[in-house]
UniProtKB/Swiss-Prot annotation:
Cytochrome c2 is found mainly in purple, non-sulfur, photosynthetic bacteria where it functions as the electron donor to the oxidized bacteriochlorophyll in the photophosphorylation pathway. However, it may also have a role in the respiratory chain and is found in some non-photosynthetic bacteria. Binds 1 heme c group covalently per subunit. InterPro entries: Cyt_c-like_dom, Cyt_c-like_dom_sf, Cyt_c_1A/1B. One of its GO terms (biological process) is photosynthesis. This is Cytochrome c2. It comes from the Bacteria.
Length: 107
């Protein structure tokens, strides 16, 4: 199990494109509120790549961690340019952080 506080620090690598928490809106990337167990390509109002929309993925813990290890490898054609998180502890911690947020941005 990851550490949400450590995950918040890891999220700084993501925050240029993604927002989370109360009032978070889509930016360069979709808002990540409620990402846990959401189907890929479903954040309201975000223009996803066809690759992401049609991936058939659901963001459970295992799928998210596999994706964030190397996004372009997991979903070829994704618009996400982030190279990935090679460190397993970082992946555990960011999932612990992100998965605590509900769709409305509350914890």
């Amino acid at each position: 199990a990851g550490d949400p506080d450590a995950g918040q620090k890891v999220f700084l690598k993501c925050a240029a494109c993604h927002k989370i928490g109360p009032g978070a809106k889509n930016g360069v990337g979709p808002s990540l509120n409620g990402v846990a167990n959401r189907k890929a390509g479903q954040a309201e109002g975000f223009a996803y790549s066809d690759a992401n929309k049609n991936s058939g993925l659901t963001w459970d813990e295992a799928t998210f961690k596999e994706y964030i290890t190397a996004p372009q490898k997991k979903v070829p054609g994704t618009k996400m340019t982030f190279p990935g998180l090679p460190n397993e502890a970082d992946r555990d911690n960011i999932w612990a952080y992100l998965s605590q947020f509900k769709a409305d941005g509350s914890k």
